[in-house]
């Protein structure tokens, strides 16, 4: 084992000699093993392994580490081969009774193959891994996504699972993850349209879900149905065949939705998709960044929020949402002014938020400010200046630039609403 370790690390002789000379005066080495292992936890795995050359006292301490991380970033072909041999030999001999965390980040196709990843995951699951993070990307575009072992989907110990990029999600029928609370799926490939549903159905205590759907996913519907879920973050490529977003999460407290156009997509008139949102009575915070114009379809599900951030497309000719909807608990509102009719949305939200305390107008990252139609802006202003929100304490305007009409608009709002805290950043 020592030969494999040294061939991976390749320590320089003069460094090894200096460290050996320093051994007699090394006070840290006198600490108990469990304390030294805690010290090693602050180091990257490769550096922690390199401490084995310090002395016999340190030779196998790293093998008690409960957290391991391996990657082949900027590795040559020969270095990859040594790393693969090192993991093959040492992971199965690792001395920690439980592997709390295993993180693997590899490019596939040269020395590291899908079967290597599969074998390492099998070992980790057998050792009761609690956190597993797999990030795979192809060295060559022709590489197929890696299929993970079936044992992963029946792990009783797994609490956190993160899967990214070149991974095939193929969920067996007996899948059951009784301890999984955090699940991240970014740009993965699903075996079929039912794979995500099968995976979510196997997680009875799931609390936090992050899903990113890229333009290469051709499923028409993204459906999230998890009764226990409390936090949901979605990033969706809205082009291609994507047609519908369905969310049924009655315990949800935090919701973030972002849609975008992928690199291979262009802006089209029919690139919108439909929302089917079930009631979310416990929702406290929502961030919506979407170009889909039918605001009314999701507003009914977010009326319980205390914090709301919106960047949505507003149709100047249609009503925003039905009368009678009220955001009674809303205290903090953030609005992105990149749509040409943003002032219409602001006017309506001010009317329907009687307990609003903080109002923030801020351009989202990578968004471009729009210039409202002067007539539309004036109409909205005439309505808003008649409003009174005594609860409002702070109005923040963070913007790159704005038209004179928009600046005047916000100045009048400030004066009318008698704000006690005003910040105007141009």
Swiss-Prot record:
Keywords: Leucine-rich repeat, Repeat
Domain of life, per lineage: Eukaryota
Matches recorded under Pfam families: F-box, LRR_At5g56370
Annotated coiled-coil segments of the chain: none
Presence of keyword Repeat: yes
Gene3D superfamilies: Ribonuclease Inhibitor (3.80.10.10)
F-box domain segment(s): 25-71
LRR repeat coordinates: 50-75, 80-106, 160-187, 188-213, 221-259, 265-290, 311-337, 338-363, 373-399
SUPFAM superfamilies: F-box domain, RNI-like
Designated name of the protein: Putative F-box/LRR-repeat protein At4g15060
Organism for this UniProt entry: Arabidopsis thaliana (Mouse-ear cress)
Lineage: Eukaryota, Viridiplantae, Streptophyta, Embryophyta, Tracheophyta
